[in-house]
């Protein structure tokens, strides 16, 4: 899904003169820092749509020809710097007309409201007037009012770009069914001690490994029908955690995408250049996890357990938990474990996944790590 930045024109992209009409080339002047800020937002995956009220455009006092020359030059300058607008929406009514297409009305937005490819949660509106903020409120998106002497406001373009493009990757997922109530909170850009409470102490200990060794803040609270058995609690926790990972990663721009064993790993055979899963030992046990946030869920598990359960966690639910994460997050995971002690083997699986996640979620720029254009 694609986020859209709706932008006002006069006073937002270009400065607004005293007569409120940019009807001559000499009146055309860009707002400070607008181009580098929009380039940053473009690289973060945003598309741009101009939404502007132009009082009485086409009337004798404001001929369309006087408007189009400076407007076309503005668009050409933006295009020369790599900034293209998906659409330019102009309302030509007068304030007294109370037209539904005039901001803060959203009459011009009908085609966009019907477009299911838009990421409305990340979309926003930037303008210099309170009507722009009201327009954002009517669309149920975030609004940023640029700081001006005439209308106030608190934001400048660099701050808006930072807020939208560098926003922390957070998610809160609440999954409620007749069998369980699961709440997962995570922040992929903050390190904190994990907090877990599922009613299953050994499972809690394993979940803590994901946050601790994954290098991100993780909090999980679960209430399930443990009087029946552990299945629903463990399965639904995996589904909620997978959904939280998917939501926090967003469009996945800039992430490593893959988690695997680096060539410098001490566990590699000398001269081995092939890509392997992220491998780690735990006493006699060795586990390997290779993953890809491809958007196509797939899980392969290679390992066996001798015991029916470790602590309060049935060993048959270990691969099932990982499969649930994959299904909900769109993750491709290959997980292998060898050893003698089942406690070590289960814990090594969780730690291997966590270390592979740490590598895959790391930001390495702004590019989308695929040739398809979407993940």
Curated annotation (Swiss-Prot):
UniProt keyword Transmembrane present: no
Listed PROSITE patterns: IGP_DEHYDRATASE_1 (PS00954), IGP_DEHYDRATASE_2 (PS00955)
Example GO BP: L-histidine biosynthetic process
GO molecular function: histidinol-phosphatase activity; imidazoleglycerol-phosphate dehydratase activity; metal ion binding
InterPro entries: HAD-like_sf, HAD-SF_hydro_IIIA, HAD_sf, His_synth_bifunc_HisB, HisB_N, Histidinol-phos, IGPD_sf, ImidazoleglycerolP_deHydtase
Reactions catalysed according to its record: D-erythro-1-(imidazol-4-yl)glycerol 3-phosphate = 3-(imidazol-4-yl)-2-oxopropyl phosphate + H2O; L-histidinol phosphate + H2O = L-histidinol + phosphate
Top-level division of the source organism's lineage: Bacteria
GO cellular component terms, A-Z: cytoplasm
Subcellular location: Cytoplasm
Required cofactor(s): Mg(2+)
Main location: cytoplasm
Keywords tagged on the record: Amino-acid biosynthesis, Cytoplasm, Histidine biosynthesis, Hydrolase, Lyase, Magnesium, Metal-binding, Multifunctional enzyme
Region entry Histidinol-phosphatase, spans: 1-168
Enzyme Commission number(s) from the entry: 3.1.3.15, 4.2.1.19
Stretches for region Imidazoleglycerol-phosphate dehydratase: 169-375
Residues bound to Mg(2+): 8, 10, 128
Pathway in which this enzyme or protein is active: Amino-acid biosynthesis; L-histidine biosynthesis; L-histidine from 5-phospho-alpha-D-ribose 1-diphosphate: step 6/9; Amino-acid biosynthesis; L-histidine biosynthesis; L-histidine from 5-phospho-alpha-D-ribose 1-diphosphate: step 8/9
Signal peptide: none
Pfam families xrefs: Hydrolase_like, IGPD
Active site annotation, chain numbering: 8 (nucleophile), 10 (proton donor)
PANTHER family: IMIDAZOLEGLYCEROL-PHOSPHATE DEHYDRATASE (PTHR23133:SF2), IMIDAZOLEGLYCEROL-PHOSPHATE DEHYDRATASE HIS7 (PTHR23133)
Family that this chain belongs to: In the N-terminal section; belongs to the histidinol-phosphatase family. In the C-terminal section; belongs to the imidazoleglycerol-phosphate dehydratase family.
Protein name listed in UniProt: Histidine biosynthesis bifunctional protein HisB
């Amino acid at each position: 899904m694609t986020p859209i930045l709706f932008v006002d024109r006069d006073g937002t992209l270009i400065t607004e003169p005293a007569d409120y009409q940019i009807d001559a080339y000499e009146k055309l002047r860009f707002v400070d820092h607008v181009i580098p800020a929009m380039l940053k937002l473009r690289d973060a995956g945003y598309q741009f749509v101009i939404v502007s009220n132009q009082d009485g455009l086409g009337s004798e006092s404001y001929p369309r020809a006087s408007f189009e020359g400076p407007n076309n030059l503005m668009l050409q300058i933006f295009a020369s710097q790599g900034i293209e607008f998906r659409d330019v929406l102009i309302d030509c009514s007068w304030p007294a007309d109370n037209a539904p297409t005039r901001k803060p009305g959203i009459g011009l937005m009908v085609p966009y409201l019907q477009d299911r490819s838009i990421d409305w949660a990340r979309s926003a509106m930037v303008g210099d007037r309170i009507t722009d903020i009201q327009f954002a409120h009517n669309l149920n998106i975030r609004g940023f009012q640029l700081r001006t002497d005439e209308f106030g406001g608190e934001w400048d373009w660099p701050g808006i770009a930072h807020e939208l493009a560098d926003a922390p990757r957070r998610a809160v997922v609440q999954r409620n069914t007749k069998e369980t109530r699961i709440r997962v909170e995570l922040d992929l850009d903050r390190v904190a001690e994990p907090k877990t409470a599922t009613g299953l102490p050994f499972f809690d200990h394993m979940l803590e490994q994901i946050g601790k060794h994954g290098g991100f803040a993780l909090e999980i609270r679960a209430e399930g029908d443990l009087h029946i058995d552990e299945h629903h609690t463990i399965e639904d926790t995996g589904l909620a955690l997978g959904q939280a990972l998917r939501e926090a990663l967003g469009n996945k721009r800039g992430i490593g995408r893959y988690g695997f064993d680096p060539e410098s790993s001490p566990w590699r055979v000398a001269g081995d250049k092939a890509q392997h899963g992220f491998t780690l030992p735990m006493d006699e046990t060795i586990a390997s996890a290779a993953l890809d946030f491809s958007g196509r869920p797939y899980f392969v598990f290679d390992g066996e357990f001798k015991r029916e359960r470790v602590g309060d966690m049935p060993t048959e639910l270990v691969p099932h938990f990982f499969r649930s994460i994959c299904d909900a997050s769109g993750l491709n995971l290959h997980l292998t474990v060898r050893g003698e002690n089942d406690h070590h083997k289960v814990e090594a699986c969780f730690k291997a996944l966590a270390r592979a996640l740490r590598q895959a979620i790391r930001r390495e720029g702004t590019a989308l790590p695929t040739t398809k254009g979407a993940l």
